[in-house]
Design a protein with these regions (language model features):
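Glycosyltransferase donor-sugar binding loop
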Residues: 158, 181-196
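Conserved acidic donor-binding segment of nucleotide-sugar-dependent glycosyltransferases
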Residues: 266-276, 284-289
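Conserved small/polar residues in nucleotide/adenosyl-binding loops
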Residues: 307-312
Length: 312
């Protein structure tokens, strides 16, 4: 399966297309068609060549900066060793843009620090609010699919098999909390990630499941049907899965890192500094010692709807 399609980047591209459709903006996916502006999301040689060709033809180039040196680290085998080279490469791509768009003020600050001179705009990847509106049977459908009882305590997370996604902490939480079911959605080819991640994914625990990639509608059911969604990531440019979870009115705990400063801890969601705080908050949410913030979370992303972020 194409890694881009099942990643946040693939989701971001779909959001861009949907936002243009909602606003009646024509677009094409064929570079041979007639167009005024080229919007590039990827970092391969073909993308870089397309930007160069478009500029030569007098077209305007928007380069979407989804990647940073910081979120490349702690991902694939050798990513830390070559992160400096990766930074040079992405900068050479982003310099092709007349403007650069990136999802958050946090990622904008990182990219500005790379010495790029083009205007940089922070625009959220957005969320399709209607698609993630909870439905009455979502919880039941999720629990039936995964063989879960109604009173099972269920914690989920979503992401590629990367260390920076907090996967090692997630597995340790499952070890520490045997009376809770932990399910991780998303996947990455195991040959591409370090040994410690492969070992973690192969961990055999009765309360730990690596469910792999599931379709967006099934994932929405999981957001609705779990007791707590956690995002233990250590580095992000935004995190579309977080927007999805908030829109689906999940009980959300994120790691307390700068990219999530736009969320108010204790109001929109809960924020944990480390594994121990995640574990404490999971228990306190389930036991009712911490109030549910489901409705507040949904409100927090209402201004990030696709129609809203794509307004002129």
């Amino acid at each position: 399966m194409n890694l881009i399609k099942i990643s946040g980047l693939g989701r971001a591209i779909m959001h861009q297309q949907r936002a243009m459709e909602l606003n009646g903006i024509e677009y094409t996916l064929d570079p041979k068609d007639s167009y005024d502006v080229v919007h590039i999301n990827t970092l391969g040689l073909k993308s870089k060549h397309l930007a160069k060709k478009a500029k030569k033809a007098g077209k305007r180039v928007v380069y979407h900066a989804h990647s940073t040196q910081e979120d490349f680290r702690n991902s694939f085998i050798g990513s830390n060793l070559i992160s400096g080279l990766f930074k040079k490469w992405i900068c050479s791509c982003y310099r092709r843009g007349d403007v650069i768009v990136t999802p958050t003020e946090y990622s904008k600050s990182l990219i500005r620090g790379y010495g790029l001179t083009a205007p940089i705009y922070a625009v959220s990847n957005g969320i399709d609010l209607a698609r993630y509106e909870p439905k009455e049977n979502d919880r039941e459908a999720f629990r039936k699919k995964f063989g879960l009882k109604d009173d099972d305590k269920v914690v989920i997370s979503v992401g590629l098999y990367f260390e920076r996604k907090g996967l090692l902490d997630f597995v340790q939480m499952a070890k520490d909390m045997p009376d809770y079911k932990f399910i991780w959605f998303g996947k990455t080819p195991l040959y591409s990630v370090p040994h410690k991640i492969r070992k973690a994914v192969k961990t055999k625990l009765p309360n730990l499941t690596f469910a792999g990639y599931v379709q967006p509608d099934e994932l929405k059911q999981a957001y609705v049907g779990c007791d707590v969604y956690i995002f233990p990531t250590l580095e992000e440019t935004e995190g579309i899965v977080l927007l999805e979870a908030l829109a689906a009115k999940a009980n959300v705990i994120v790691r307390d890192i700068p990219v999530f400063d736009w969320l108010n801890g204790g109001t929109d969601c809960y924020k944990a500094k480390d594994k121990d705080e995640f574990e404490r908050m999971i228990k306190e949410i389930y036991e009712g010692k911490l109030p549910s913030l489901r409705e507040n979370g949904r409100k927090a992303v209402e201004n990030l709807s696709l129609i809203h972020i794509s307004e002129p």
